[in-house]
């Protein structure tokens, strides 16, 4: 997230910047995906488990049982739905997400893909069709949805480019990244406004998270080729993604800028906010509730521990081993075998 960053005096993500002021914001959320990339993010957010050490979890073990976010919320009376702009066969999303516990899976074939940008349907046309789908769900509901336009290769059509970048930057991958994020930010603003108009916003909590890093993960070399570079263009070596929790019923936000955390911490944090008894999940999640912890750390996929200054050496060793522990638990179908 290019929080509060500007080019030519224009904010890259003005809608998200406003949202952050009224949200719980975790700017040091570390990417923990492995070989399943985007699908690993779906896994972690919904199960608080780290992905397999080799291959895609959704392809290799789509039928593993989990004490998952959708399963737990179904127990609280929620309908659950996963909505994806990709085809269900991509990363084996359909089998993987239904296996995790979602009641319903909606994919590419349910959308009118009359405008495509990059990998698939434009975020504008996607959100225009997602809102009616959400309106049809029985309340209360938990819905997960994914956007595509801010994903590489960042080839946003000129007609949607609004930042007025200089020619060199505009033609570069970095410029395309800025413009793609600006476009997606605009569509997120539209989406939230539409939820409000349809009466869906006031009783909702909206969590926004990136699945993995963008420009530096795949196009880092292209930045070095620019004749002019701002310091903040450069790779810091910390692969972080945004994690924002917006509750429209509260006006005060809080930024946890000293907190280091990972994608596996999303599920226990959301369950805490939704009032689900911690006894139902705290012994089956590898992540932690970020609103009730003094531990600041994340284990990334190469085994590096980020943060953790207040951890003992024994704790650091245990957390580093969580990568292999999760791998064994998934392959052993831990939730099924514990019942």
Identify what each model region corresponds to.
Residues 1-339:
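Solvent-exposed soluble domains appended to multi-pass membrane proteins
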């Amino acid at each position: 997230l290019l929080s509060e960053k500007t080019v030519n005096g224009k904010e890259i993500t003005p809608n998200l910047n406003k949202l952050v002021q009224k949200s719980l914001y975790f700017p040091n959320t570390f990417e923990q995906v492995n070989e399943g990339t985007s699908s690993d993010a779906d896994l972690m957010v919904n199960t608080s488990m780290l992905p397999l050490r080799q291959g895609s979890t959704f392809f290799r073990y789509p039928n593993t049982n989990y004490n998952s976010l959708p399963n737990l919320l179904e127990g609280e009376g929620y309908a659950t739905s996963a909505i994806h702009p990709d085809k269900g066969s991509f990363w084996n999303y359909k089998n993987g997400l239904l296996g995790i516990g979602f009641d319903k899976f909606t994919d590419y074939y349910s959308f009118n893909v009359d405008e495509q940008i990059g990998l698939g349907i434009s975020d504008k046309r996607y959100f225009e069709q997602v809102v009616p789908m959400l309106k049809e769900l029985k309340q209360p509901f938990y819905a997960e949805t994914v956007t595509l336009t801010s994903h590489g290769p960042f080839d946003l059509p000129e007609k949607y480019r609004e930042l007025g970048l200089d020619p060199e930057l505009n033609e570069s991958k970095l410029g395309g990244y800025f413009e793609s994020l600006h476009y997606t930010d605009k569509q997120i603003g539209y989406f939230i406004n539409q939820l409000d108009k349809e009466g869906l916003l006031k009783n909702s909590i909206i969590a926004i998270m990136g699945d993995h890093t963008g420009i530096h993960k795949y196009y880092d070399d292209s930045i070095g080729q620019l004749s002019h570079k701002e310091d903040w263009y450069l790779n810091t070596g910390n692969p972080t993604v945004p994690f924002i929790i917006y509750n429209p019923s509260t006006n005060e936000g809080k930024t946890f800028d000293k907190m280091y955390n990972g994608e596996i911490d999303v599920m226990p944090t959301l369950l805490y906010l939704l009032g689900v008894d911690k006894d139902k999940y705290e012994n089956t999640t590898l992540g932690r509730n970020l609103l009730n912890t003094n531990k600041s750390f994340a284990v990334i996929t190469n085994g590096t521990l980020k943060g953790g200054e207040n951890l003992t050496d024994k704790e650091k060793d245990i957390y580093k081993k969580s990568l292999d522990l999760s791998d064994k638990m998934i392959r052993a179908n831990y939730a099924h075998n514990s019942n």
